[in-house]
A protein has these predicted regions:
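Concave beta-strand-loop units of leucine-rich repeat
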Residues: 1, 8-23, 27-43, 50-64, ...
Length: 109
C-alpha cells in the first residue's frame, strides 16, 4: 500500500496507521476526526485540510518535510517528532496544550 485516501469520510473519528508503509495520506475533509496516529511511514504528503475537530495528532518518524495543521483549530496535542520537517505551519491553535517537534530540521516556528 503506497497511498491511503480517506478524503470526505464524514463519520471517521479515530485513525491508527502505525507502521503502515504509506507514501501519501489524505485525511482532508474528515470533519469528525478527533484522533490520528501515524508513525513509521515514509510520507511525502499528509493532507489535513478541513479537520476542525482534530484534537490529537501523532505523526512521528514519517519522513515528512512539511506539515500544515493551521486548519485544525481544536488541536490539543501534536507530536511530529522524528521527521525531516523544515516547515511546520501551526497558525492559530488556541486549544494546543502539548507540542513535540523534536528531531526535525526546523529553523523556526
Amino acid at each position: 500500500m503506497s497511498g491511503l485516501v480517506l478524503e470526505g469520510m464524514a463519520g471517521l473519528e479515530y485513525l491508527d496507521c502505525l507502521s503502515l508503509p504509506l507514501d501519501t495520506l489524505d485525511l482532508s475533509e474528515c470533519p469528525r476526526l478527533r484522533e490520528a496516529y501515524i508513525g513509521g511511514a515514509r510520507l511525502t504528503t499528509l493532507d489535513l485540510r478541513g479537520n476542525p475537530s482534530l484534537e490529537r495528532l501523532f505523526c512521528t518518524d514519517c519522513g515528512l518535510r512539511s506539515l500544515d495543521v493551521s486548519g485544525c483549530s481544536a488541536l490539543t496535542a501534536l507530536n511530529c517528532s522524528g521527521n525531516r520537517l523544515s516547515s511546520l505551519t501551526v497558525g492559530r491553535l488556541p486549544a494546543l496544550e502539548a507540542l513535540n517537534c523534536s528531531f526535525n530540521d526546523l529553523a523556526s516556528l
